[in-house]
Amino acid sequence: MLIAQRPTLSEETVDEFRSRFVIEPLEPGFGYTLGNSLRRTLLSSIPGASVTSIKIDNVLHEFSTIEGVKEDVTEVILNLKGLVVSSEHDEPVTMYLRKSGAGDVTAADIAPPAGVEVHNPDLKIATLSDKGKLEMELVVERGRGYVSAVQNKGADNEIGRMPVDSIYSPVLKVTYKVEATRVEQRTDFDKLVIDVETKPSIRPRDAIASAGKTLVELFGLARELNVEAEGIDIGPSPVDEQLAADLALPVEDLQLTVRSYNCLKREGIHTVGELISRSEQDLLDIRNFGAKSIDEVKAKLVEMGLSLKDSAPGFDPHAALAAYGDDDDDAFVEDEQY
């Protein structure tokens, strides 16, 4: 069995909708394999939502003009292509826009139904004159990739309903590069850097996660041919290894006071793993193990990034440890007596 070191994935946030992801170390050659697969999946296969058709009052086709509206219908449709929406519905849903009087018509004037959100309300759609009026229906559907207006035109399309081009992908741009990185004495490992920029409807980290899920599902088809086929196994992450080591640590290595250690030992709690499986009440039920002993244990566990089973967040270990003074037995006196 060949075991490769588990790569780490870190995120560097450039702005709210752009992040840079670093995956390293990868076996030689896998940087380009993974980078190209992720890029193509991110650009083509991340689910999203888009407007698929519109209907404007008193307008029959896209080559019309609208009384009191500066832009013609074609310009309005072009502006709507910049609309960023998300939908929780699998079926098509309808949004409504109604505006009258002089001024700009923006995406903020759209009234979406429950489960649909407009993410760029400042988008300008049209300009109205004093007597201008614009009433419109917008159909939103979920999908992926790009679908042309011709494809969106249904066989039973009603008169006045105009199909539009739909850009479902919430990912705007993806670039990647592969650099060399070092692991111990070897310098030929790959370091993959992926730069992802998205629309406001999705975060870059969620887009990466979606692409990873899609690729795992697809590559799983090949694995089903022989689930026992030999390949490169990925080793445990450093975090998992450290956690396993911490849980196996003997309680005596926590350097507790003699009273606390003896109480735990008498209860049969010998490792940190056994300790964190207990609640505060479980420990308080131990004879001569009081509230101060609880605080001492919690402080030691917090230093390791661990906690008791039901410990509330916000515990201050420094304040608790300051109350103990020196490490000798007299510095830690319980209210209970032997």
From Swiss-Prot:
Q: Name one GO cellular component term.
A: cytoplasm
The gene coding this protein? rpoA
Q: Which UniProt keywords apply?
A: DNA-directed RNA polymerase, Nucleotidyltransferase, Transcription, Transferase
What organism does the UniProt record list as the source?
Answer: Nocardioides sp. (strain ATCC BAA-499 / JS614)
Family stated for the protein in its record: Belongs to the RNA polymerase alpha chain family.
Name of the molecule in the record:
DNA-directed RNA polymerase subunit alpha
- Which InterPro entries does the record match to this protein? DNA-dir_RNA_pol_insert (IPR011262), DNA-dir_RNA_pol_RpoA/D/Rpb3 (IPR011263), DNA-dir_RpoA (IPR011773), RBP11-like (IPR036603), RNAP_asu_C (IPR011260), RNApol_insert_sf (IPR036643)
| Subunit organization | Homodimer. The RNAP catalytic core consists of 2 alpha, 1 beta, 1 beta' and 1 omega subunit. When a sigma factor is associated with the core the holoenzyme is formed, which can initiate transcription.
Instruction: Please describe what this protein does.
Output: DNA-dependent RNA polymerase catalyzes the transcription of DNA into RNA using the four ribonucleoside triphosphates as substrates.
Picking any one GO molecular function of the record gives: DNA binding
Q: Does the keyword Ribonucleoprotein apply?
A: no
Q: What is known of its domains?
A: The N-terminal domain is essential for RNAP assembly and basal transcription, whereas the C-terminal domain is involved in interaction with transcriptional regulators and with upstream promoter elements.
What reaction is this protein's catalytic activity?
Answer: RNA(n) + a ribonucleoside 5'-triphosphate = RNA(n+1) + diphosphate
What EC numbers are recorded for this enzyme?
2.7.7.6
Query: Where do the segments described as Alpha C-terminal domain (alpha-CTD) lie?
Result: 240-338
Spell out the Pfam families in the cross-references: RNA_pol_A_bac, RNA_pol_A_CTD, RNA_pol_L
The segment annotated Alpha N-terminal domain (alpha-NTD) runs over 1-226
Q: Write out the GO biological process terms.
A: DNA-templated transcription
